[in-house]
């Protein structure tokens, strides 16, 4: 074999097959950019173990992480959205709904369940932000009212985890009506003397923040959650001024007295149970054993 044949044989040798990694095994933190093992991140409730950044969490997973295992019963799942107005922007509303339902496996942006929290009966609602930005339409409002009615029937407290861009524009006035509808329902909770706790997660904006999300007997926020009516960019363009750092974030709002406390997600379940037990004059719950990954200290010189 000549020298040129040896070179050609080496260049045409089939490379060894590399082990393929299934899609979705790894993910990257939105804040620090650290590559994270997906299963470990899920065990840590979507909180980055390196920088403690609270990533967005699916509504159904959130309810399962808070309520007692085996106690959950879904409410209002039979309610489904309809394109009554035959609305169309760049795409038909019914097509947007179909796409969102296919992508999320949910029928709308709010999931309601009743169950127990450390043995206490409770009704809980959580937004699915992946469903059209967690926007509030007729079904979201109807399910929220169903949650209130169930809490009244069971004489138990209610809590809601908000993650929404606001009212759903494709339902026009019908979506705006839900602001008054949900607020009126909560007035019945107040008359009965039953606690309603609102947990604001990233983001809670628009018509949701202007209605039931800020009407809690206790308004709790997750760290660095964006909370407000209009977004920072819209405000800057309107007032033509640069907004202060951290504007509309949880830490900014608690300084101004707009919310009551900031609670990290790994201890949220126990904090909610403790507060509700006190509000309902029940014995204090036993503290959960939290097995979260330790947050690595940040290098100040980095």
UniProtKB/Swiss-Prot annotation:
Instruction: Name the predominant localization.
Output: cytoplasm
The reply on keyword ATP-binding is yes
Q: Membrane-spanning regions, if any?
A: none
Give the record's cofactor note, including how many are bound: Binds 1 zinc ion per subunit.
Quote the cellular component terms of the Gene Ontology held in the record: acetate CoA-transferase complex
Tell me the ranges covered by the CoA carboxyltransferase N-terminal domain, including all copies: 25-294
* InterPro entries to which the protein is assigned, alphabetical: AcCoA_carboxyl_beta, Acetyl_CoA_COase_Trfase_b_su, ClpP/crotonase-like_dom_sf, COA_CT_N, Znf-ACC
Q: Report the catalytic activity.
A: N(6)-carboxybiotinyl-L-lysyl-[protein] + acetyl-CoA = N(6)-biotinyl-L-lysyl-[protein] + malonyl-CoA
Q: Where Zn(2+) is bound, by residue?
A: 29, 32, 48, 51
In its keyword annotation, does this UniProt entry include Zinc? Answer: yes
Which is a GO BP term held by this UniProt record? malonyl-CoA biosynthetic process
Q: What is its EC number?
A: 2.1.3.15
**GO MF terms on file?**
acetyl-CoA carboxylase activity; ATP binding; carboxyl- or carbamoyltransferase activity; zinc ion binding
Which cofactor is essential here?
Answer: Zn(2+)
Record keywords, A-Z: ATP-binding, Cytoplasm, Fatty acid biosynthesis, Fatty acid metabolism, Lipid biosynthesis, Lipid metabolism, Metal-binding, Nucleotide-binding, Transferase, Zinc, Zinc-finger
Tell me the first and last residues of the signal peptide.
Answer: none
Q: Could you tell me which SUPFAM superfamilies the record lists for this protein?
A: ClpP/crotonase
Zn finger region (C4-type) = 29-51
**Protein function:** Component of the acetyl coenzyme A carboxylase (ACC) complex. Biotin carboxylase (BC) catalyzes the carboxylation of biotin on its carrier protein (BCCP) and then the CO(2) group is transferred by the transcarboxylase to acetyl-CoA to form malonyl-CoA.
- Which protein family is it in? Belongs to the AccD/PCCB family.
Instruction: State the HAMAP family in the record.
Output: AcetylCoA_CT_beta (MF_01395)
Q: How does it assemble?
A: Acetyl-CoA carboxylase is a heterohexamer composed of biotin carboxyl carrier protein (AccB), biotin carboxylase (AccC) and two subunits each of ACCase subunit alpha (AccA) and ACCase subunit beta (AccD).
Q: What is this protein called?
A: Acetyl-coenzyme A carboxylase carboxyl transferase subunit beta
Q: Which organism is it from?
A: Erwinia tasmaniensis (strain DSM 17950 / CFBP 7177 / CIP 109463 / NCPPB 4357 / Et1/99)
């Amino acid at each position: 074999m000549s020298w040129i044949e040896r070179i050609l044989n080496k260049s045409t040798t089939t490379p060894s097959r590399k082990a393929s990694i299934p899609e979705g095994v790894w993910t990257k933190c939105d804040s620090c950019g650290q590559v994270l093992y997906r299963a470990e991140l899920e065990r840590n409730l979507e909180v980055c173990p390196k920088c403690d950044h609270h990533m967005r969490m699916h509504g159904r997973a959130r309810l399962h992480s808070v309520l007692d295992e085996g106690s959950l019963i879904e409410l209002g799942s039979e309610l489904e959205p309809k394109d009554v107005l035959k609305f169309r922007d760049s795409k038909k509303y019914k097509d947007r709904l179909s796409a969102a339902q296919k992508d999320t496996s949910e029928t709308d942006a709010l999931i309601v369940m009743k169950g127990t929290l450390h043995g206490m009966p409770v009704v809980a609602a959580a937004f699915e932000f992946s469903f059209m930005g967690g926007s509030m339409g007729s079904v979201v409002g109807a399910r929220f009212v169903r949650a209130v009615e169930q809490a009244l029937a069971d004489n138990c407290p209610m809590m809601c985890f908000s993650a929404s861009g606001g009212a759903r524009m494709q339902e026009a006035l019908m979506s705006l009506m839900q602001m008054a509808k949900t607020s009126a329902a909560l007035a019945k909770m107040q008359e009965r003397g039953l606690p309603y706790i609102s947990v604001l997660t990233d983001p809670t904006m628009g018509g949701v923040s202007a209605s039931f999300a800020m009407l809690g007997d206790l308004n709790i926020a997750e760290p660095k959650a964006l909370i407000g009516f209009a977004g920072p960019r819209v405000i800057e363009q309107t007032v033509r001024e640069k907004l202060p750092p951290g504007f509309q974030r949880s830490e900014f709002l608690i300084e101004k007295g707009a919310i009551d406390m900031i609670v990290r997600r790994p201890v949220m379940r126990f904090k909610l149970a403790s507060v509700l037990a006190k509000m309902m004059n029940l014995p204090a719950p036993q503290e959960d054993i939290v097995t979260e990954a330790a947050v690595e200290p940040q290098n100040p010189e980095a």
